[in-house]
Swiss-Prot record:
Disulphide bridges: none
Cofactor(s) listed in the protein's UniProt record: [8Fe-7S] cluster
Name of the protein this chain belongs to: Nitrogenase molybdenum-iron protein beta chain
Assembly mode: Tetramer of two alpha and two beta chains. Forms complex with the iron protein (nitrogenase component 2).
PROSITE patterns documented for this protein: NITROGENASE_1_1, NITROGENASE_1_2
Length: 459
């Protein structure tokens, strides 16, 4: 049986990284809460860098506050920074939730964030009385360990631990932990579940906050917030759901919390490609005790028909390199095998064991040996591609210069995509998303390998 060749970058220095620090993931998750604001307990750059990245990808503003730690706070602590920051946010913006996100600075100096948060709550209750309704959630995200995927998972876990309340009655809903995906993907998941008559609780829903028209507030007294997002009562009600499906491997701690504390079963399933989407649909149907609708079967049939039209003619026998988010890399790699493309090189900045297990499955199904680069970076991928080139690269915009230098066409997916527009609205999940991805891959192959010889297009 073919095996995977697991490789690490072999050096301490990271060049052109594939991951960033934990606070990014926590900020992203908090922005998916209706009238939610992240308050970053760190220096100004900790929020500026994230806002810049989100603006480039989504072309939308990201409201992120910061306690603005300076040299004095590094010595004497950031007590006043948190208390004043929370009070200013609550009084001026009246959010439903403030997620207090720690950074390397605040974690290293050992700030008692929970204690400072309680002081701020006490003072706000004294000043505002019943008008103080904001939920405060402490999210621990030390930047010097793990990555932004773990930061996202820590945020979801913190929301559940702080807010969820079990009332004993099942709400007949299905929790969905989407991970760091695009608005189009979240909407596609909602569409599929809607066809099965399943009501989801998205933990958390970043679709409308990052892709909606900006409208003024109805009254001058009501601060502006983007529409959509997961309401705080929905998070509180997540403990009464029938089950949870996580689209990210880093939703494991949130799944464990819901299962152990509230007896809500949880499973992992990322619906990219035919088999993975079949798996997602079956799990959702089993947990929710619902039937798969004819409309969903029709969407699957359209995907299979598209694959029959295109795979053997244009794609079979080609090779690809896939890099980025481990959930996306594993899902796309399996879909490539379904198309007859060998994912010869896969590269991610993490070393998640579930990712390695998934890639073993991909190698077995492809009947090919696959290079799986973990805890790696784009420099290592570039070196590998220089030695063993492929027909396609599939990943985010950070690999564009490598693709240009090596003359390999790049199919852009995931986060971030900043040198093309509209990609955040086009799903790659579900059956319809797989059709989108298939068309994108095929059109790239046609442009690169068929257009230079126009006679091939007539065959």
């Amino acid at each position: 049986m073919p095996e995977i060749n697991v490789m690490e970058r072999g050096r301490e220095l990271v060049v052109n990284p594939l991951v960033t620090c934990q606070p990014f993931g926590a900020m992203f998750a908090t922005l998916g809460i209706r009238r939610g604001l992240p308050l970053v307990h760190g220096s100004q750059g900790c929020s500026t860098f994230v806002r810049y990245g989100l603006n480039r990808h989504f072309r939308e503003p990201a409201e992120i506050a910061v306690t603005s730690l300076h040299e004095d706070a590094a010595v004497f602590g950031g007590r006043s920074n948190i208390i004043n920051g929370v009070k200013n946010l609550v009084k001026r913006f009246r959010p439903d939730l403030v997620g207090i996100v720690t950074t390397c600075s605040s974690e290293i100096i050992g700030d008692d964030v929970d204690g400072f948060m309680r002081v701020a709550e006490t003072e706000l209750r004294e000043e505002l009385g019943d008008r103080f309704q904001t939920k405060l959630v402490h999210i621990s995200t030390p930047s010097f360990v793990e990555n932004h995927f773990r930061g996202y998972g820590n945020a979801i876990k913190s929301f559940i631990e702080t807010l969820s309340r079990e009332d004993g009655d099942c709400n007949h809903k299905l929790n969905i932990i989407p991970g760091i995906v695009n608005p189009g993907d979240i909407r596609e998941i909602g569409h599929m579940l809607g066809l099965m008559d399943i009501t989801p609780i998205i933990l958390t829903d970043t679709s409308d906050p990052f892709d909606s028209p900006l409208r003024p507030s109805k009254t001058e007294q009501m601060p502006f917030y983007p529409p959509g997002g997961t309401a705080v009562p929905e998070i509180e009600d997540s403990s009464n759901s029938m089950g949870t499906l996580s689209l990210t491997m880093y939703g494991d701690e949130a799944l464990n919390t819901l299962e152990k504390r509230f007896r809500v079963p949880g499973e992992y399933s990322m619906p990219i490609g035919v088999r993975n989407t079949d798996d997602f649909v079956r799990r959702a149907a089993r947990i929710s005790e619902k039937d798969v609708s004819d409309e969903l079967l029709d969407e699957r049939g359209i995907l299979i028909d598209s694959m029959a039209d295109l795979s053997s003619r244009y794609l079979f026998g080609r090779t690809a390199a896939v890099y980025g988010d481990p959930d996306m890399v594993a899902g796309i790699s399996r879909f490539l095998c379904e198309l007859g493309i060998t994912p010869l090189h896969t590269c991610t900045g993490t070393d998640n064991e579930l990712f390695i297990d998934r890639m073993k499955t991909v190698a077995a199904e492809a009947d090919e040996r696959i290079n799986v680069m973990v805890k790696s970076d784009l420099r290592a991928l570039e070196e590998r591609l220089s030695e063993e080139p492929v027909d396609l690269m599939i990943g985010n915009s950070d690999g564009r210069l490598i693709a240009q230098d090596l003359g390999i066409p790049l199919v852009r997916v995931g986060y971030p995509v900043y040198d093309r527009v509209g990609y955040q609205r086009v799903p790659i999940t579900g059956y319809r998303g797989a059709v989108n991805l298939l068309n994108r891959i095929t059109n790239t192959v046609l442009r690169e390998y068929y257009e230079p010889q126009h006679w091939k297009l007539q065959q």
